[in-house]
């Protein structure tokens, strides 16, 4: 199944190259903007301004990423898209994207403070262990959040349900999620080579949405076969049969 996923991601990216490039250019310029915003904020002595600039940065980038979610879902479902769909989608994602950006920024800020305190200032073994636990919790959270935008785009759930399902998908498909995380890191590395014009956020969203769409076949299959009761039986999914119509 993973081999087919890689092939589909490449074909979908190539067939929608113009939209991928346009979205990535918008995201790239926004990225430059938030970098300058944070540089300006760091030049001040006001901690509140620094935190505010940091939070606004994640909210803005989240809005631009979420806006491409519906287009990525259409691409994953073999539907055509229009360039203007991306910009038209922005008003509809403002609430969820802002909450997501706020959530991520709060997690990062709390983690930064915790690591600074427990690893550098706390001299006890308990403090070190607590700091390590926080790091691992963050790893689980961010691995789960890989699925947030694809879940929202494919299932059209509200923020709370998307968050809940993100963790369910992660813990039920931990190995697959780790593979997708590594794949995302590879895409990010390749994006740097292409100066962010190709692959980048649009390519990653297409890849993750394709991954979730194919993975959901597993749950359709298990629902149709309630006799597969044990964990061992539920692991044997006939992927070649399930993705046959997509080939």
State what each model feature region is.
Residues 1-120, 127, 144-147, 151-247:
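Helix-coil boundary and N-terminal low-complexity module in membrane systems
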Residues 129-141:
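Alpha-helical transmembrane segments of multi-pass membrane proteins
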């Amino acid at each position: 199944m993973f081999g087919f996923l890689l092939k589909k991601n490449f074909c979908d990216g190539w067939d929608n190259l113009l939209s991928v490039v346009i979205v990535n250019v918008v995201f790239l310029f926004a990225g430059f903007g938030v970098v300058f915003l944070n540089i300006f904020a760091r030049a001040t002595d006001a901690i509140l301004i620094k935190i505010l600039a940091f939070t606004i940065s994640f909210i803005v980038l989240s809005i631009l990423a979420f806006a491409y979610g519906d287009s990525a879902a259409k691409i994953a479902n073999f539907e055509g898209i229009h360039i203007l769909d991306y910009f038209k989608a922005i008003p509809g994602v403002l609430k969820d994207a802002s909450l997501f950006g706020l959530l991520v920024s709060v997690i990062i800020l709390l983690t930064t403070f915790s690591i600074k305190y427990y690893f550098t200032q706390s001299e006890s073994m308990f403090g070190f262990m607590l700091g390590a636990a926080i790091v691992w919790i963050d790893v689980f959270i961010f691995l789960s959040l890989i699925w947030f935008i694809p879940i929202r785009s494919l299932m059209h759930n509200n923020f709370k349900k998307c968050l809940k399902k993100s963790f369910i998908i992660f813990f039920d498909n931990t190995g697959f999620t780790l593979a997708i995380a590594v794949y995302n890191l590879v895409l990010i590395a390749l994006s740097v080579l292409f100066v962010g014009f190709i692959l980048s956020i649009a390519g990653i969203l297409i890849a993750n949405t394709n991954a979730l769409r194919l993975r959901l076949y597993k749950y359709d299959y298990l629902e149709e076969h309630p006799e597969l009761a044990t964990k061992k039986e539920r692991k044997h999914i006939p992927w070649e049969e399930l993705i046959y119509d997509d080939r």
